[in-house]
Structure formats: structure tokens, C-alpha cells
Amino acid sequence: MSEEALGELSGYIKERLGDAIEEAKLAYGELTLSVPAASIISVLTFLRDDVQCQFVNLTDISGVDYPQRAKRFDVVYQLMSPRQNQRIRVKVQADEDTLVPSAVPVFVGAEWFERETYDMYGVLFSGHPDLRRILTDYGFEGHPLRKDFPLTGFVEVRYNDELKRVVYEPVQLRQEFRNFDFLSPWEGTDYVLPGDEKAKAN
């Protein structure tokens, strides 16, 4: 879709929804709307039902973690309008305590997307019919896609053939932890990385 058509759509949505749209941004041929959490249901309903929009497909809901922000999470809704041949992205900011209204009443397919976002990031959705983990184990501690989640996790899960059940154990690293220097992609490290001995010698 052309930038001009997206610009017209952005203007139309802002005119119709007013203060429910905090920001409408066009970048890289895509339109992104930033919306307060309290307005997400009315905005999604409008985008689905309005004749000029007809975004009837919710293709994904995902999370993004920005730990340096007060509202550290973005909940991102990806919508598609087959009739208009358009896509749009809607973003809501939340923190660990902010309840984001569930989109299930508007898009029934949102149920598992929201469960995944809860499981991976810990974002809470109010009014969700079954908000529980979907990808991790029931006893899993933490939310693995948060930036502050340890790379190794908290526990190791494996099947114990002697006990004939899954067991949880403290993490045991099979190799020594390696600290790679990624501060500058343009400058090399001061030390020789494993496997680079020949390259550094030349």
C-alpha cells in the first residue's frame, strides 16, 4: 500500500477516534497507532467494523520489553484488512501491574495470543477467559522473554527415566560460561576468542 493511502487512512482514523489515538506513525510503509490501554477495545472494534477500515483479521499479538521505561512493555496487535489490502499495527504500553483489557470479545482468536504474551512477558489481560501459561511448564518461574530473565533460566527440566517423571533441578552448565564482548561491533576484543588463535597470530 502506498504511503499516500496510509497517510489518508491515518488521518481518517485520528479524525474518527480523536483522543483514543495517542500517536499515529508512518514508517517503512507501515502504519502504527499508539493507544492507551483503556481505549484498546474501542479502537480494535472500530478498526474491525468501520467500512473504511475492515481490519477483520487479528494476525498476532506480541510483546516487547523495554526495561528502562516506567511502562516497560509494549503489547503489539497486528491487524489485516483483506478487503482493503492493508495492514496496521496497534501498540499499548503496560507495566507489570497494568491490566490490559482482553481483546477476546472483539477477536476470538486473541485468546491464545494473549496467553502467549502473558506467558513470555507477564503482561496481565483483564477479562481473559483462561489466562494461564501456554508455552512453558505449569511450575515455570518467571517470564523468559523479559530482558532481565537469566539466559540459563532458574531451573533445569528433564525426564528422569528411573523416576519415570519430569524432574526440576538446579541449572548445571555443561561448559564454562563465556563472556563475549559485544559493546562495539566495529572493534575487536582485547583477548583471543576460542578458535581464533590462528587468525590473531597472523
UniProtKB/Swiss-Prot annotation:
Keyword hit for Translocase: yes
GO molecular function: NADH dehydrogenase (ubiquinone) activity; NADH:ubiquinone reductase (non-electrogenic) activity; quinone binding
Reactions the enzyme catalyzes: a quinone + NADH + 5 H(+)(in) = a quinol + NAD(+) + 4 H(+)(out)
Membrane topology qualifier: Peripheral membrane protein
InterPro entries: NADH_DH_suC, NADH_quin_OxRdtase_su_C/D-like, NADH_UbQ_OxRdtase_30kDa_su, NADH_UbQ_OxRdtase_CS
This enzyme's EC code(s): 7.1.1.-
Keywords, comma-separated and alphabetical: Cell inner membrane, Cell membrane, Membrane, NAD, Quinone, Translocase, Transport, Ubiquinone
GO CC annotations, alphabetized: plasma membrane
Disulphide connectivity of cysteines: none
Location within or outside the cell: Cell inner membrane
Top-level taxon in the UniProt lineage: Bacteria
Stored Pfam families: Complex1_30kDa
The keyword Thylakoid appears for this protein: no
Task performed by this protein: NDH-1 shuttles electrons from NADH, via FMN and iron-sulfur (Fe-S) centers, to quinones in the respiratory chain. The immediate electron acceptor for the enzyme in this species is believed to be ubiquinone. Couples the redox reaction to proton translocation (for every two electrons transferred, four hydrogen ions are translocated across the cytoplasmic membrane), and thus conserves the redox energy in a proton gradient.
Family according to the record: Belongs to the complex I 30 kDa subunit family.
Entry-linked PANTHER family: NADH DEHYDROGENASE [UBIQUINONE] IRON-SULFUR PROTEIN 3, MITOCHONDRIAL (PTHR10884:SF14), NADH DEHYDROGENASE UBIQUINONE IRON-SULFUR PROTEIN 3 (PTHR10884)
Record note on quaternary structure: NDH-1 is composed of 14 different subunits. Subunits NuoB, C, D, E, F, and G constitute the peripheral sector of the complex.
Protein name: NADH-quinone oxidoreductase subunit C
Organism: Brucella anthropi (strain ATCC 49188 / DSM 6882 / CCUG 24695 / JCM 21032 / LMG 3331 / NBRC 15819 / NCTC 12168 / Alc 37)
